[in-house]
Amino acid sequence: MSLETVGLTHKLDLTLRRMQGQGLLLTSVDPDGKPNVMTIGWGNPGVVWGRPVFVVLVRPSRYTFQNIETTGEFVVNVPTESLAEACEHCGTVSGREHAKFKECGLTPRAGRHVEAPLIEECVLHYECRVLQRNDLVESQLDADVRKEFYGAGDCHRVYYGEGLGTLARV
């Protein structure tokens, strides 16, 4: 696969459609270099502090949380529709117990700016370095949002990832 450097807004409509549908694939790497992937359905590409960013939400209970906290980086990968089953699987099992890349037939590929891998089978990749992290405060959440998404606690940490590079399959 050949990759071309593109801007943050390249195929933004595709990124948003996938996020609202089957989800995006968030990759990280643990301190030993083991890659991990999880599905995310919440996020926000944009501009903060005059920099391109991709904001993602990760719960502290997730294996990915530990990886991002340790390395300070992640990649948001935009899958094709044909990866719907992989997105489903990566959103339901933990990388602590499962080799999700292998189980889903996904190929980790070295990126250009971070150690977290790109996913070869995806069409767009946002390589990010954490600029800021904030924990959601349960008591400050809208009551309906709190009831629907945080009944058991485990509020997300919000990561503002500076876009170090956006790569598209050509």
What spans do the regions from the language model cover?
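Active-site-proximal mixed secondary-structure blocks
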Residues: M1-V170
